[in-house]
């Protein structure tokens, strides 16, 4: 299993496209999924970024949820679309602190639209999950979100 994950990460690193997707900036916004929380994204290169989510609840079912992913983006150009339309994939992890703590792997697959001359981006993703602690089980998350991007060039 570890070899398969390592192979996936190395293959993704070696085949990552060089198209300039965003390349800079830090995004902060909201992600609507299970659980809904605060979404961040930090661009680390022309087509790579780290993203993270933090979510919490203090109702009857108290929990704290954290995830982090390393993402690879591919730029798709269209004459009909003025902004940047990106697909992305990645690998990451998640931790859920609740009655039953969970630790697992994430493989996000998504689309991202970066508005032209605007500091906003929106995204939709489907994420296969593999929890490893306290027991091995799989799941699937679906999310949508919006972020305000700080440090994005005004000409984009």
Predicted regions and their residues:
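Residues on the lipid-exposed face of transmembrane beta-strands in outer-membrane beta-barrel proteins
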Residues: 30, 38-42, 52-54, 68-74, ...
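Mid-chain, well-packed structural core segment of small domains
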Residues: 80-122
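Transmembrane beta-strand segments that form the barrel wall of outer-membrane beta-barrel proteins
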Residues: 22-34, 44, 48-58, 87-97, ...
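Short loop/turn motifs that connect adjacent beta-strands in outer-membrane beta-barrel proteins
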Residues: 20-25, 47, 75-86, 116-120, ...
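Positively charged n-region of N-terminal signal peptides that target proteins for export
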Residues: 1-5
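Bacterial N-terminal signal peptides
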Residues: 7-16
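Residues that define the transmembrane beta-barrel architecture of outer-membrane proteins
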Residues: 24-26, 34-36, 48, 62-66, ...
């Amino acid at each position: 299993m570890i070899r398969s994950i390592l192979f996936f990460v190395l293959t993704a690193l070696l085949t990552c496209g060089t198209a300039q997707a965003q390349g800079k900036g830090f995004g902060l916004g909201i992600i609507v999924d299970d659980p809904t929380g605060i979404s961040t994204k930090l661009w680390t290169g022309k087509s790579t970024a780290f993203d993270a989510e933090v979510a919490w609840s203090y109702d009857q079912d108290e929990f704290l949820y954290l995830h982090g992913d390393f993402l690879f983006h591919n730029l798709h150009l269209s004459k009909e679309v003025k902004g940047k339309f990106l697909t992305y994939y990645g690998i990451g992890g998640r931790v859920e602190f609740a009655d039953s703590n969970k630790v697992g792997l994430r493989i996000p697959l998504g689309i991202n639209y970066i508005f032209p001359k605007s500091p906003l981006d929106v995204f939709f993703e489907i994420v296969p999950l593999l929890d490893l602690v306290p027991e091995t089980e799989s799941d699937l998350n679906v999310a949508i979100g919006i972020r305000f991007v700080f440090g994005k060039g005004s000409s984009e």
